[in-house]
């Protein structure tokens, strides 16, 4: 988006209505999905085992942190960074990860 008014309107919408509107739990996220594990996804896409363990994952457009929480939970060796246009939605993502013990409070 190059129109500042449009960007501000989108940010305002997501500040008011963080997405996705999933409940915030006081525990790690439930279940397992191979798509959230970088090694499984890498192997699926390339047909090879990853050659290294130290990895950085960018969750661009992380929204309320549902995907970020799974990425951190299923990839404890990785550095995971979530970014989003909406400060309000990022606050929800941070709370989600802190409450599920996936993020150290700062």
Swiss-Prot record:
GO terms for molecular function: methyltransferase activity. InterPro entries: Methyltranfer_dom, SAM-dependent_MTases_sf. It comes from the Bacteria. The keyword tRNA processing does not apply. Induction: Present in both red- and green-light-grown cells. Keywords: Antenna complex, Phycobilisome. GO terms for cellular component: phycobilisome. The keyword Membrane does not apply. Gene3D superfamilies: Vaccinia Virus protein VP39. PANTHER family: METHYLTRANSFERASE, SLL0487 PROTEIN. This is Uncharacterized phycocyanin operon protein W.
């Amino acid at each position: 988006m190059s129109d500042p008014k449009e960007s501000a309107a989108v940010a305002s919408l997501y500040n008011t209505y963080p997405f996705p509107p999933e409940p915030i739990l006081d525990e790690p996220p439930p279940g397992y999905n191979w798509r959230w594990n970088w090694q499984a996804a890498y192997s699926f896409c390339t047909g090879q085992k990853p050659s290294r363990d130290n990895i950085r994952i960018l969750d661009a457009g992380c929204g309320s942190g549902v995907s970020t929480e799974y990425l951190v939970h299923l990839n404890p060796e990785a550095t995971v960074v979530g970014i989003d246009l909406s400060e309000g939605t990022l606050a929800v993502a941070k709370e989600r990860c802190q409450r599920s013990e996936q993020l150290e409070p700062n």
